[in-house]
């Protein structure tokens, strides 16, 4: 467990202070705590006694190790950046390193209104090629699941693994536990989405003959629906749209999240609302660990401005209501 980690270098009190501060803000900070233990060992191994970070005493830490992936290197540097900021805040002037290792940003497919209409038509019309009652039930889950992904901008993993204990439909809230970035958060549903989910849960309870454990049960109801199953279904249904063979970049399930975010920013622009004002709220809704992650979408919007040209349409006009079969 992260709370059993013992730091012993001259930076130990500051590392402990940083981890406590992060956890008090709601971050789990488990993986980062172990990386900081590695940094604590690095500090000891080099016999550093100082309590400030400099380019010189960080040189060895910032080097990419043999067979070390870019992602892990970024994580190692990232915790030191956080520590440097923490030290600076306490008056210990420290060097803040730059993350030189970069990922190539993937091209995203921001779905247009017409693409969304066709996609959700296929989702709502989907019927399995079998009369198996569990596959029939799952066909009823997909319209809700994909609406949750699109209307709430949630990640696919946290959506699939949503348990009923995390769902409060009286308050219209999902509690996302230990999401990406190791931070819990609340996701608020609109009144329409809340009503839709209530009807859906009533359906699940009736079909299963008991209160469901998972909001999106898999074929075996004691387990949640799998991410590969959702991706495969999305791909199969996208292929049935008229856009499948005409778009340059095939969309993924995750692009529903990108489309949600892009539409929110465009809507604010139409209403004259500053993106900077809304940035903290959007960042919290998406579960980002930093505003920099959310800022990424601002550039997507600039690139996709001409693609999503009907920005004033509400999602309810684009996505039809779910009809129970």
Task: Please identify what each model-predicted range represents.
Residues 1-325:
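Conserved catalytic core of the tyrosine transesterase superfamily
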